[in-house]
Amino acid sequence: MLNMSSDQEPPCSPTGTASSMSHVSDSDSDSPLSPAGSEGRGSHRPPGISKRDGEEPMDERFPACIRDAVSQVLKGYDWSLVPMPVRGSGGLKAKPHVKRPMNAFMVWAQAARRKLADQYPHLHNAELSKTLGKLWRLLSENEKRPFVEEAERLRVQHKKDHPDYKYQPRRRKSVKAGQSDSDSGAELGHHPGSQMYKSDSGMGSMGENHLHSEHAGQNHGPPTPPTTPKTDLHHGGKQELKHEGRRMMDNGRQNIDFSNVDINELSSEVISNIEAFDVHEFDQYLPLNGHGAIPADHGQNTTAAPYGPSYPHAAGATPAPVWSHKSSSTSSSSSIESGQQRPHIKTEQLSPSHYNDQSQGSPTHSDYNTYSAQACATTVSSATVPTAFPSSQCDYTDLPSSNYYNPYSGYPSSLYQYPYFHSSRRPYATPILNSLSIPPSHSPTSNWDQPVYTTLTRP
């Protein structure tokens, strides 16, 4: 907005700069300045032109006498002096840019701006542009006629001078448009990408390496709700993903994407519909063992989605890096963490196999590194579990008899309603949940072993 008066007026009121130049820059094609501005700047240089009618007294409210003066100026003005600004930023290039012919408003604005800038150098160009636009809309057809005629003459002259002229939009503007396009493209590309991650392995079990990486620095994997920056840019995509995740839940509940589902929604939405499931249908998807120290690996969101292929990686004793990048740490780690904070919400925080491991508290399995499927009553080592897991060797159908789904007679035998989360059982749950976030290694520490033997034996 540093235009013709940049050398003589202090920018006093920067308000409205962007919008006020819109009238002018619409028909301008070269520089960010209006032709009125750039020519105005150049017009101070040729002697005898700049202060041509500056002696007339004018009111700041632009009365009708100004319009008459401007039209008089236009009638006697030599337009051949105008086209090239003498000292413009990019005015004198090797190949000068051909501007579009001015329309009637530009003719009016250029002459009036020059006149007013000479008269009132303190007027900010933005305010000037705004007022010129308002005045132009108030002009009658009769008052506009001289400007329209001048614009028509300029158009004909322009056509003569540049017979093969083609309008090319300002390069700066096109870069801006491309930039915003690429921005939105990146945003759109980013969200489907993370959606692909989440739907691809959204219900896959959570590797403890992801839990560690989240606690350590949250540096890889798709963005999770705890780490996603709460910006407007991601907000729309996140809402969209939330609806998409909900749509997936409604669609036969293929995979519940916990990263985009608020835990409060989950408690009402998922739990209210959870009775519709056959709990035995879930059993083939339950992980047999995760990594020893963090049974939160068993906190997989166990839905009926066939994610068997991703479990063998998760079930190994060592975290598989391929799986860790592919699986969604967002899906269950957030629900695990919220499980640690709010143990009373009866969602899929910790899976049955984990509670079976601890509620039976069977000391016969001395190898706590493997957690190898005590539900199957077999000491399969963690090396063989990946091959054994997707198959139906480990069938939990006999578990209700061994108090697997219903360890306490007072509670309904539903997959997700564990007494550990009720207030009467809170003392049993809190040592587990507190210990989940503590041990970072693959071998249990003493502060975890003790609660298993002392507080979690079966009543």
Curated annotation (Swiss-Prot):
Single Gene Ontology BP annotation = enteric nervous system development
UniProt region (Disordered), positions on chain = 1-57, 152-247, 293-367, 439-459
Family annotation (Pfam families): HMG_box (PF00505), Sox_N (PF12444)
Region: Transactivation domain (TAC), residue numbers: 342-459
Could you tell me in which tissues this protein is expressed? Answer: From gastrula to neural stages, expressed in a ventrolateral domain around the blastopore. A second domain of expression appears at mid-gastrula stage (stage 11.5) lateral to the neural plate, in the presumptive neural crest. At neurula stage (stage 15), also expressed in the prospective cement gland. As development proceeds, expression persists in migrating cranial crest cells as they populate the pharyngeal arches, and in trunk neural crest cells. Not expressed early in the otic placode, with otic expression only beginning around stage 30.
**Locations of Low complexity compositional bias?**
19-34, 324-338
Q: Where in the cell is it found?
A: Nucleus
Q: GO CC terms for this protein?
A: nucleus
Q: Where is the composition biased (Polar residues)?
A: 1-18, 348-367
Q: Which GO terms describe its molecular function?
A: DNA-binding transcription factor activity, RNA polymerase II-specific; RNA polymerase II cis-regulatory region sequence-specific DNA binding
Q: Which Gene3D superfamilies match?
A: High mobility group box domain (1.10.30.10)
PROSITE patterns (UniProt xref): HMG_BOX_2
Q: Which residues bind DNA?
A: 98-166
Question: In which residues does the motif 9aaTAD occur?
Answer: 413-421
Q: What happens when the gene is disrupted?
A: Impaired neural crest cell migration and delay in neural crest formation leading to severe defects in multiple lineages of the neural crest.
Compositionally biased, Basic and acidic residues: which spans?
152-167, 231-247
Q: Where is this region: Dimerization (DIM)?
A: 56-96
Q: Supply the InterPro entries for this chain.
A: HMG_box_dom, HMG_box_dom_sf, Sox_N, SOX_TF
Region span, Transactivation domain (TAM) = 222-297
Alphabetized UniProt keyword annotations? Developmental protein, DNA-binding, Nucleus, Transcription, Transcription regulation
Function according to Swiss-Prot or TrEMBL = Transcription factor. Acts early in neural crest formation, functioning redundantly with the other group E Sox factors sox9 and sox10 to induce neural crest progenitors. Regulates the onset of expression of many neural crest marker genes including sox10, and regulates the development of multiple neural crest derivatives. May be required to regulate neural crest cell migration.
Quoted from the entry, the domain comment is: The transactivation domains TAM and TAC (for transactivation domain in the middle and at the C-terminus, respectively) are required to contact transcriptional coactivators and basal transcriptional machinery components and thereby induce gene transactivation. The 9aaTAD motif is a transactivation domain present in a large number of yeast and animal transcription factors.
- Name of the molecule in the record: Transcription factor Sox-8
The species this protein was found in: Xenopus laevis
